Regions:
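Sec-dependent N-terminal signal peptides of Gram-positive bacterial secreted proteins and lipoproteins
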Residues: 2-23
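A residue-level marker of the well-folded mature domains of exported/periplasmic proteins
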Residues: 20-325
């Protein structure tokens, strides 16, 4: 097991340009009350919400670059609503922002707003959830959803010695679908394994919990959970714990949340994956600064992930603490 984790860590870390980890997030700014610096660029960033640590870490990484260069960051939340995201982009266009960063909650629904920003001469950077309208954006920054799902599925197979039922929950999100496709295609390689896929409207804890409860009621012999986000895993772990199965179900998720890190240290969870949200924010900021200085920016920037296990969790936490100083 250590061999596979070490191999994957070596692979993804060889791609990294800077140290990994997530920095504890700052309190998000109110949309209308950001303190503006007039010397640098002004960039607005739209996240899916202002609660999940992942999104807060992206914003913190962006702030670390832009504000240290005399610029301003304004944080918007679409609340997973594409129409709200469109309105927020239109608001930034009217207010003549220099750059816009957005995670694409709906590729087709966001298209008109991307056209408006392009026509207004405002460069758009997509991150995490990207767009097919590559001609309308400056760059796209993300971890590859399918690849990380495929890695997690294979890792689960090794933990379970290639036998047993594994569960996950999908949502209409394209990125979630890609991750779950990776899960499925990895698990399909093992004839003695089965992936049970539930469905939910979104990846929030409150919508995931009843879905996982239902899966466990029908399939009490499930021995693995593959989670695609912090909030989703919060709901799943609550259901697993309520069923008295915490410690019996192998848990691998994309979270790196304080709860997941604690569970890893306590041996209640095997692996949690850090998508390097803070680094995604840093790359957004660096891309905007490069463009503002007339430098070339890659059209697609792949961000490596970091697998956290009981063997390296303390090292990971020390790295995060160092970055927060």
């Amino acid at each position: 097991m250590k061999r596979l984790v070490a191999l994957m860590l070596a692979l993804v870390m060889s791609l990294a340009l800077v140290a990994c980890g997530s920095k504890p997030a700052e309190t998000p700014s109110d949309n209308s009350d950001a303190t503006e610096n007039t010397d640098g660029i002004k960039i607005g960033i739209i996240t899916l919400n202002m609660e999940a640590q992942y999104w807060l870490d992206v914003v913190a990484g962006l702030r670390s670059v832009i504000e240290s260069n005399g610029g301003t960051v304004v944080h918007y939340s679409s609340e997973n609503d594409v129409q709200k995201a469109v309105q927020q982009i239109e608001d930034m266009i009217v207010k003549e922002f220099d750059y816009i960063a957005v995670t694409c909650v709906d590729k087709q629904g966001l298209h008109p707003a991307l056209v408006q920003a392009h026509d207004a001469g405002i460069p758009v950077i997509t991150y995490d959830k990207t767009t097919d309208d590559t001609d309308l954006v400056l760059t796209q920054i993300q971890t590859n959803d399918y690849d990380i799902g495929f890695y997690m599925g294979n890792l689960m197979a090794e933990y379970l010695k290639e036998e047993g039922k594994v569960m996950s929950v999908t949502t209409p999100s394209v990125s979630v679908s890609d991750r779950n496709r990776g899960f499925q295609e990895a698990i399909d390689q093992y004839p003695n394994m089965e992936l049970i896929m539930g469905e939910a409207a979104n990846a929030l804890a409150e919508t995931t919990l009843p879905v996982v409860e239902s899966i466990l009621q029908v399939n009490p012999d499930v021995i693995g959970w593959l989670g695609i986000s912090e909030t989703q895993s919060m709901g799943a772990i609550s259901a697993i714990e309520a069923a008295g199965m915490l410690g019996q179900v192998t848990i691998i998720d994309m979270s790196a949340s304080p709860t997941s890190l604690s569970f890893v240290k306590e041996g209640k969870q095997e692996v949690t994956i850090d998508q390097q949200a803070y680094q995604i924010g840093v790359l957004i900021g660096e891309s905007a600064l490069k463009n503002s200085n007339g430098e070339d920016v890659e059209s697609y920037i792949a961000v490596p992930w970091y697998a956290i296990t009981k063997d390296n969790v303390e090292e990971y936490e020390a790295m995060v603490a160092e970055r927060s100083k």
